[in-house]
UniProtKB/Swiss-Prot annotation:
Domain of life: Eukaryota
Role: Binds to muscle nicotinic acetylcholine receptor (nAChR) and inhibit acetylcholine from binding to the receptor, thereby impairing neuromuscular transmission.
Keywords of the record: Acetylcholine receptor inhibiting toxin, Disulfide bond, Ion channel impairing toxin, Neurotoxin, Postsynaptic neurotoxin, Secreted, Toxin
Protein's name according to its UniProt entry: Short neurotoxin C
Tissues showing expression: Expressed by the venom gland.
Main subcellular location of this protein, as a coarse class: secreted
SUPFAM superfamilies, alphabetized: Snake toxin-like
Biased composition (Polar residues): 1-16
Length: 62
């Protein structure tokens, strides 16, 4: 699986996930800096107030 891993509005970058990892995620929240977006491999548990979208295809988490 390949997932995007750039932060917020940085230029697009992606990486290959470890063998057996078939999910990508996109996590979004707000703080004093504004809206923060984090992307990567897997499907993490998030705190309340954090939007999480997980998906299972190549580069699906932009």
């Amino acid at each position: 699986r390949r997932c995007f891993n750039q932060q917020s509005s940085q230029p697009q970058t992606n990486k290959s996930c470890p063998p057996g990892e078939n999910s990508c995620y996109r996590k979004q929240w707000r703080d004093h800096r504004g809206t923060i977006i984090e992307r990567g491999c897997g499907c993490p548990t998030v705190k309340p107030g954090v939007k999480l979208r997980c998906c299972q295809s190549e580069d699906c988490n932009n």
